[in-house]
């Protein structure tokens, strides 16, 4: 080969060598870049996988949270229904308690009225007993007077019978004496003396008989007056005794009626007291039930407030940060 050809070939070879070296360098740089790109791609794929996994986990968490939110909403609705039912029941219990209180007030008023009436009836009974005692005393006094008058009447009747007997005896004695005198005169046989004695006897005997008859008539008049007075007194006394007996029977009847009324009022008072005790016990039980219902309502309200606070977990800053980061990751992945 000539020198001119060598001189022309050398620069070409040099250029070729330089090009080869530059190509090699480029290939090496490309290989390194390819390795870097592959490493980046692997890292990006790993990060993408991680992001997909985190996204799936976030989606699962979101679904779980949605399910929990639905469950909490259902529980909240159920508790609201229970709360409304308990509130309505509490209102009913309160209304019933008010009705029981009104009944208790009415029963107390009736019991007080019955107690007042019983007290007034007791006072009336005591007054009637006093009146009855006074009337019994007066009746006893009248009975004593009646017995005294009866004794007096018996004495008068005895005296009257004795006077009648003595009058009969006197008349018999006078007749006997007249007979004896007449018999003695007849036996003596004296004529003039007989006529004179007969005249004297005729004069004396009518005078005595007239006097005796007058005395007897006076005594008879006195006896008739006494009999009339005794009859009047006995009639008045019988009338008074009948009136007193009728009054006594009336007083006894009124006393029995008042005793029956008192017993009825006492029975009504006992029933009213028992009803008041029962109503007080029912009222206390209702108060306890209302307190328990109010406590349950307050507990349910507190639980509902706590669940509502738990239900508002999306308002928390941590949840907002997690959601914003997941959204940014999803945007970056979608852009890539």
Swiss-Prot record:
The keyword Iron-sulfur does not apply. Residues 125-261 form a coiled coil. It is found in: Nucleus inner membrane; Nucleus, Nucleoplasm. The keyword Coiled coil applies. It is a single-pass membrane protein. Keywords: Coiled coil, Membrane, Nucleus, Transmembrane, Transmembrane helix. It comes from the Eukaryota. This is Nuclear envelope-associated protein 1. The gene is NEAP1.
